[in-house]
């Protein structure tokens, strides 16, 4: 990606045509939580995509998707699709960063066409913060002391963003890291939950996610958690919106229970990867 | 966060102190260091404040300007944050070193201000869909002595409290073009309601306990913590886990509960102090001489 770091581009005058959409009067008033809830979930507690509030979207995982990378993984969580590539351990690129423990460099990027509103091809502030969050979460899981003076690069590219990109990135990155044979304490499983005044929605889609623009109400928020199920440790925690501490406790419990259920799926994918790698090695030895 | 090198013995000393609820400087685990606050220092800014939390020094200036509102939100004004970690604060911020931290603080502030009804942005609208007030909140980190998130949030809240927004009247002319008239009286201004504006509380975990307002040495001993944005009504508007360690869900929940209690107290004391300063009137400014 050509990155021009010397010039500051002025603001673009182009804007999305969806702003010209005629909004009906009902939509204008439904900033209130009660109507928002009606929009997302009907009286029988079924969401727009026919899920129950505590149902997550179907998960698809595959490793070895980038042949040149040391390890890679692809995740599909409903319509959210992202790819993660892991390179390393290799020598630290910047000479000043010389540490006794290994270092992790994470890059989180939305493809320009991945979201409803076009993203710039350079990392903007939101992506930089998400990269930092991803790095801090993975640093808790990776055994950094196993590769001193070296660095591992984790690159996440979101191909389609339909809600919970950070949660999917956490799961995908830890799968990619483990398939790259980077020593880790535990797999990180990411999950997110949307809080509405009377119900919690697990694994929200983009439409269900809390938007800072729309909701100005109490008890409306979004929580993304990165959890290490075997060690029972939370390594990433991001909450946005207005909540009470009691609600936060409930949301955390829901998310950790979900992560425990997802862990065997990730482990199964990893097991199949290892079996395939061993089978390939066996074939190569036979060929020799 | 200048290069803090602690020996194992020093780290053990801090750990034991925290266990006994007696930190190196004599505080308990939930005590803040002394805070010095002064507002209205910068004459060219619509609102300003300087907050010194022990060794952390932050200067905030708020400038109000007229601009067109965002197309998605035609009836609201905006708040734009910018954090500048100057190289004066600590040698690590030299060049572009402080950019990451500045970006994180900026983004977290934006998130915590956008949630809920912390600040009523509809008040900042002048002419629906055409003109609105934009508050540029510029934060200068002059010195870094640990616990930047808290210092910055308290300074920003104080600066917004004292921000004067000029009154503008919309005069409709015969043609379609409405004209904006600025009030002739320079003291005819309005202020924002900052009652619900959140304060950030940082809690770092050391051993089995957590601390409020960590010093740089304590930050070095700790591997993880949370930053919680607590609004005036004791609600939590944003949370982020910081540091490269991990937390058990139960300790995380108890940290959140403590943070909301501490945040409520901090909010109350800050508002009280700001009211007192306002009542004291335009006495001699101490400024940077102290």
Residues covered by each model-derived region:
Chain A
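Polyanion-binding surfaces on beta-sheet-dominated domains and ring/shell assemblies
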Residues: 1-288
């Amino acid at each position: 990606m050509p990155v021009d770091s010397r010039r500051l581009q002025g603001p673009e005058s182009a804007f999305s045509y969806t702003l010209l959409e005629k909004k009906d009067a009902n939509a204008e008033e439904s900033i209130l939580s009660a109507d928002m809830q009606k929009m997302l979930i009907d009286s029988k507690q079924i969401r727009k995509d026919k899920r129950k509030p505590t149902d997550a979207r179907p998960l698809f995982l595959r490793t070895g998707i980038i042949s040149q990378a040391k390890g890679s993984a692809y995740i599909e969580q409903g319509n959210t699709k992202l790819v993660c590539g892991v390179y390393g351990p290799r020598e630290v690129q910047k000479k000043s960063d010389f540490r006794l423990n290994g270092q992790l460099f994470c890059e989180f990027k939305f493809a320009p066409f991945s979201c409803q509103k076009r993203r710039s091809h350079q990392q903007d502030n939101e992506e930089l913060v998400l990269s930092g969050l991803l790095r801090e979460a993975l640093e808790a899981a990776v055994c950094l002391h196993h590769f001193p003076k070296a660095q591992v690069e984790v690159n996440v590219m979101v191909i389609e963003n339909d809600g919970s990109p950070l949660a999917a990135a956490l799961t995908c990155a830890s799968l990619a890291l483990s398939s790259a044979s980077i020593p880790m304490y535990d797999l990180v499983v990411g999950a997110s939950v949307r809080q509405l005044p009377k119900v919690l929605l697990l694994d929200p889609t983009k439409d269900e996610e809390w938007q800072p623009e729309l909701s100005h109400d109490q008890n409306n928020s979004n929580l993304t958690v990165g959890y290490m199920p075997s060690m029972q440790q939370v390594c990433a925690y991001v909450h946005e919106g207005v909540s009470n501490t009691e609600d936060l406790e409930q949301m955390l419990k829901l998310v950790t229970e979900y992560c425990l259920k997802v862990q065997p799926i990730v482990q199964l994918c990893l097991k199949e990867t290892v079996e395939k790698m061993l089978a390939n090695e066996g074939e190569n030895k036979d060929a020799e | 966060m200048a290069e803090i090198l602690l020996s194992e013995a020093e780290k053990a000393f801090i750990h034991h102190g925290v266990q006994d609820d007696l930190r190196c400087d004599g505080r308990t685990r939930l005590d803040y260091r002394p805070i010095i606050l002064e507002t209205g220092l910068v004459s060219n800014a619509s609102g300003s404040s300087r907050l010194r939390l022990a060794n952390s020094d932050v200067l905030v200036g708020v400038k109000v300007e007229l601009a067109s509102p965002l197309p998605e939100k035609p009836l609201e004004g905006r708040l734009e944050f910018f954090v500048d970690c100057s190289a004066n604060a600590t040698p690590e911020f030299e060049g572009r070193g402080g950019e990451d931290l500045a970006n994180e603080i900026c983004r977290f502030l934006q998130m915590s201000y956008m949630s809920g009804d912390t600040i009523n942005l509809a008040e900042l609208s002048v002419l629906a869909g055409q003109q609105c007030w934009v508050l540029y909140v510029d934060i200068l980190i002059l010195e870094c002595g640990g616990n930047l998130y808290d210092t910055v949030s308290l300074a920003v809240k104080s600066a917004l409290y004292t921000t004067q927004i000029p009154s503008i009247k919309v005069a409709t002319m015969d043609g379609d073009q409405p004209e904006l008239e600025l009030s002739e009286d320079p003291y005819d201004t309005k202020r924002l309601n900052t009652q619900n504006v959140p304060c950030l509380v940082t809690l770092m975990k050391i051993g089995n306990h957590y601390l409020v307002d960590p010093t740089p040495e304590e930050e070095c001993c700790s591997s993880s913590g949370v930053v919680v944005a607590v609004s005036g009504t004791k609600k939590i508007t944003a949370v982020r886990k910081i540091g490269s360690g991990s937390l058990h869900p139960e300790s995380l929940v108890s940290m959140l509960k403590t943070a909301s209690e501490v945040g409520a107290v901090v909010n109350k004391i800050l508002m009280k102090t700001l009211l007192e300063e306002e009542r004291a009137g335009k006495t001699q400014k101490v400024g940077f001489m102290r």
